[in-house]
A protein has these predicted regions:
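Predominantly extracellular/secreted Zn2+-dependent metalloproteases
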Residues: 1-153, 163-208
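Walker B catalytic acidic pair
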Residues: 159
Protein backbone atom coordinates (compact mmCIF):
# COMPACT_ATOMS: atom_id res chain seq x y z
CA UNK A 1 0.00 0.00 0.00
CA UNK A 2 1.55 3.33 -0.99
CA UNK A 3 2.07 6.00 1.64
CA UNK A 4 -0.95 8.23 2.29
CA UNK A 5 0.55 11.32 3.99
CA UNK A 6 -2.72 13.25 3.78
CA UNK A 7 -4.48 10.77 6.08
CA UNK A 8 -4.73 11.51 9.79
CA UNK A 9 -5.23 9.02 12.61
CA UNK A 10 -8.93 9.92 12.65
CA UNK A 11 -9.23 8.72 9.05
CA UNK A 12 -8.00 5.22 9.84
CA UNK A 13 -9.73 2.32 11.56
CA UNK A 14 -7.93 -0.91 12.42
CA UNK A 15 -10.10 -4.02 12.19
CA UNK A 16 -8.96 -7.54 12.98
CA UNK A 17 -11.07 -10.30 11.41
CA UNK A 18 -10.51 -13.89 12.46
CA UNK A 19 -12.37 -17.13 13.05
CA UNK A 20 -10.13 -18.01 16.00
CA UNK A 21 -12.39 -19.24 18.87
CA UNK A 22 -10.48 -17.25 21.50
CA UNK A 23 -10.80 -14.00 19.56
CA UNK A 24 -14.48 -14.71 18.91
CA UNK A 25 -14.97 -14.74 22.68
CA UNK A 26 -12.98 -11.53 23.14
CA UNK A 27 -15.24 -9.80 20.61
CA UNK A 28 -18.19 -10.37 22.95
CA UNK A 29 -16.70 -8.27 25.77
CA UNK A 30 -18.67 -5.03 25.94
CA UNK A 31 -16.47 -3.16 28.42
CA UNK A 32 -13.28 -1.37 27.42
CA UNK A 33 -11.11 -1.79 30.48
CA UNK A 34 -7.41 -1.01 30.35
CA UNK A 35 -5.18 -3.57 32.06
CA UNK A 36 -1.92 -2.38 33.61
CA UNK A 37 0.46 -3.55 36.30
CA UNK A 38 2.00 -1.79 39.28
CA UNK A 39 4.30 -2.54 42.20
CA UNK A 40 2.40 0.16 44.11
CA UNK A 41 4.39 0.72 47.34
CA UNK A 42 6.42 -2.51 47.17
CA UNK A 43 9.72 -0.60 47.01
CA UNK A 44 8.84 1.53 50.03
CA UNK A 45 8.57 -1.26 52.56
CA UNK A 46 4.79 -1.48 52.43
CA UNK A 47 3.30 -4.19 54.63
CA UNK A 48 1.13 -5.65 51.87
CA UNK A 49 2.26 -4.68 48.36
CA UNK A 50 4.86 -6.78 46.53
CA UNK A 51 6.14 -6.99 42.96
CA UNK A 52 4.24 -8.92 40.31
CA UNK A 53 6.13 -11.61 38.38
CA UNK A 54 5.60 -12.70 34.75
CA UNK A 55 3.43 -15.70 35.65
CA UNK A 56 1.19 -13.64 37.94
CA UNK A 57 0.85 -11.06 35.16
CA UNK A 58 -0.44 -13.81 32.88
CA UNK A 59 -2.90 -14.99 35.50
CA UNK A 60 -3.97 -11.37 36.04
CA UNK A 61 -4.72 -10.84 32.36
CA UNK A 62 -6.65 -14.13 32.25
CA UNK A 63 -8.63 -13.09 35.34
CA UNK A 64 -9.55 -9.71 33.85
CA UNK A 65 -10.52 -11.23 30.50
CA UNK A 66 -12.64 -13.89 32.16
CA UNK A 67 -14.34 -11.42 34.47
CA UNK A 68 -15.14 -8.93 31.69
CA UNK A 69 -16.38 -11.72 29.42
CA UNK A 70 -18.60 -13.15 32.15
CA UNK A 71 -20.13 -9.76 32.95
CA UNK A 72 -21.08 -9.38 29.27
CA UNK A 73 -22.57 -12.87 28.99
CA UNK A 74 -26.22 -13.79 28.83
CA UNK A 75 -25.63 -16.44 31.48
CA UNK A 76 -24.47 -13.88 34.03
CA UNK A 77 -27.12 -11.32 33.26
CA UNK A 78 -29.93 -13.87 33.51
CA UNK A 79 -28.63 -15.04 36.88
CA UNK A 80 -28.17 -11.47 38.10
CA UNK A 81 -31.85 -10.77 37.44
CA UNK A 82 -32.65 -13.24 40.23
CA UNK A 83 -30.79 -10.90 42.62
CA UNK A 84 -33.12 -7.97 41.94
CA UNK A 85 -33.54 -6.17 45.26
CA UNK A 86 -30.81 -8.22 46.98
CA UNK A 87 -27.79 -6.25 45.79
CA UNK A 88 -27.61 -3.24 48.13
CA UNK A 89 -25.50 -0.10 47.91
CA UNK A 90 -23.48 1.52 50.71
CA UNK A 91 -26.66 2.98 52.17
CA UNK A 92 -28.53 -0.31 52.14
CA UNK A 93 -30.71 0.65 49.18
CA UNK A 94 -31.37 -1.79 46.30
CA UNK A 95 -29.06 -1.27 43.33
CA UNK A 96 -30.70 -0.77 39.94
CA UNK A 97 -29.36 -3.69 37.91
CA UNK A 98 -29.26 -1.84 34.60
CA UNK A 99 -27.30 0.96 36.28
CA UNK A 100 -24.91 -1.64 37.69
CA UNK A 101 -24.41 -3.15 34.24
CA UNK A 102 -23.59 0.28 32.87
CA UNK A 103 -21.24 0.93 35.77
CA UNK A 104 -19.32 -2.24 34.92
CA UNK A 105 -19.17 -1.41 31.20
CA UNK A 106 -17.93 2.13 31.84
CA UNK A 107 -15.41 1.23 34.55
CA UNK A 108 -11.99 2.45 33.43
CA UNK A 109 -10.00 -0.69 34.05
CA UNK A 110 -7.67 -2.41 36.48
CA UNK A 111 -4.11 -1.75 37.61
CA UNK A 112 -3.10 -5.20 38.78
CA UNK A 113 -0.82 -5.73 41.75
CA UNK A 114 0.32 -8.42 44.15
CA UNK A 115 -0.31 -8.47 47.89
CA UNK A 116 0.80 -10.59 50.84
CA UNK A 117 -0.75 -10.89 54.28
CA UNK A 118 -4.24 -10.23 52.94
CA UNK A 119 -6.28 -11.79 50.14
CA UNK A 120 -6.70 -8.57 48.21
CA UNK A 121 -6.81 -4.79 48.14
CA UNK A 122 -9.03 -2.86 45.75
CA UNK A 123 -10.75 0.40 44.97
CA UNK A 124 -11.13 2.57 41.88
CA UNK A 125 -8.62 1.15 39.40
CA UNK A 126 -6.47 -0.44 42.11
CA UNK A 127 -6.79 -4.22 42.08
CA UNK A 128 -4.39 -6.36 44.06
CA UNK A 129 -4.65 -10.05 44.92
CA UNK A 130 -2.45 -12.57 46.68
CA UNK A 131 -0.68 -15.20 44.59
CA UNK A 132 -3.06 -17.96 45.68
CA UNK A 133 -6.05 -15.84 44.68
CA UNK A 134 -4.76 -15.10 41.18
CA UNK A 135 -4.09 -18.82 40.70
CA UNK A 136 -7.06 -20.18 42.64
CA UNK A 137 -10.06 -18.69 40.85
CA UNK A 138 -10.25 -21.17 37.94
CA UNK A 139 -12.98 -23.80 38.07
CA UNK A 140 -10.41 -26.60 38.34
CA UNK A 141 -8.59 -24.95 41.24
CA UNK A 142 -11.11 -26.53 43.62
CA UNK A 143 -12.37 -30.10 43.88
CA UNK A 144 -15.31 -31.13 41.66
CA UNK A 145 -18.58 -30.65 43.49
CA UNK A 146 -17.17 -28.21 46.03
CA UNK A 147 -18.96 -24.92 46.70
CA UNK A 148 -17.92 -22.35 44.08
CA UNK A 149 -17.66 -19.56 46.67
CA UNK A 150 -14.05 -20.33 47.60
CA UNK A 151 -11.89 -17.68 49.26
CA UNK A 152 -9.91 -16.80 46.09
CA UNK A 153 -13.13 -16.27 44.10
CA UNK A 154 -14.69 -14.34 46.96
CA UNK A 155 -11.60 -12.09 47.06
CA UNK A 156 -11.67 -11.67 43.27
CA UNK A 157 -15.20 -10.28 43.22
CA UNK A 158 -15.00 -8.59 46.65
CA UNK A 159 -12.16 -6.39 45.42
CA UNK A 160 -13.97 -5.68 42.17
CA UNK A 161 -16.96 -4.59 44.25
CA UNK A 162 -14.63 -2.02 45.82
CA UNK A 163 -13.46 -1.00 42.34
CA UNK A 164 -17.08 -0.24 41.50
CA UNK A 165 -17.24 2.07 44.51
CA UNK A 166 -18.95 -0.16 47.05
CA UNK A 167 -17.87 -0.44 50.69
CA UNK A 168 -18.26 -3.13 53.33
CA UNK A 169 -21.62 -1.55 54.16
CA UNK A 170 -22.99 -2.86 50.86
CA UNK A 171 -23.75 -6.42 49.75
CA UNK A 172 -21.21 -6.04 46.94
CA UNK A 173 -18.22 -7.10 49.04
CA UNK A 174 -19.23 -9.37 51.94
CA UNK A 175 -22.27 -11.58 52.38
CA UNK A 176 -23.99 -14.15 50.21
CA UNK A 177 -25.06 -11.90 47.37
CA UNK A 178 -22.69 -10.37 44.80
CA UNK A 179 -19.65 -12.57 45.40
CA UNK A 180 -21.75 -15.76 45.50
CA UNK A 181 -23.58 -14.77 42.30
CA UNK A 182 -20.31 -14.05 40.51
CA UNK A 183 -18.38 -17.07 41.80
CA UNK A 184 -21.20 -19.46 40.93
CA UNK A 185 -21.59 -18.27 37.34
CA UNK A 186 -17.80 -18.05 36.92
CA UNK A 187 -17.30 -21.70 37.90
CA UNK A 188 -20.16 -22.96 35.73
CA UNK A 189 -18.90 -21.07 32.69
CA UNK A 190 -15.39 -22.40 33.31
CA UNK A 191 -16.65 -25.97 33.60
CA UNK A 192 -18.57 -25.59 30.36
CA UNK A 193 -15.57 -24.16 28.49
CA UNK A 194 -17.26 -20.82 27.89
CA UNK A 195 -14.67 -18.46 29.40
CA UNK A 196 -11.72 -17.18 27.35
CA UNK A 197 -9.27 -18.92 29.72
CA UNK A 198 -10.99 -21.75 31.57
CA UNK A 199 -8.16 -23.62 33.25
CA UNK A 200 -5.11 -22.70 35.29
CA UNK A 201 -3.16 -25.13 33.12
CA UNK A 202 -3.84 -23.03 30.01
CA UNK A 203 -1.76 -20.28 31.60
CA UNK A 204 0.91 -22.30 33.37
CA UNK A 205 1.68 -24.58 30.41
CA UNK A 206 2.60 -21.66 28.15
CA UNK A 207 6.34 -21.20 27.51
CA UNK A 208 7.98 -18.56 29.68
Amino acid sequence: VPAQPELSNDDVTLLVRTEDPFMKKIEQIDSRWFIRFSAYSADKGHAYWRHMDPLLCRHGVALALNMAFMFASEEFNVEMNAYEGKLKDNGGKPINLDALRQRIRSHGGLVLGRVVGVGGLGGGNTYGLADYCYKGVYFDATAPGSHPHSYPRQAMFHEYGHCLGYSHSSTMTYGNQWTVLCATVFVVMGQEGKLPVCSKEQVENLPM
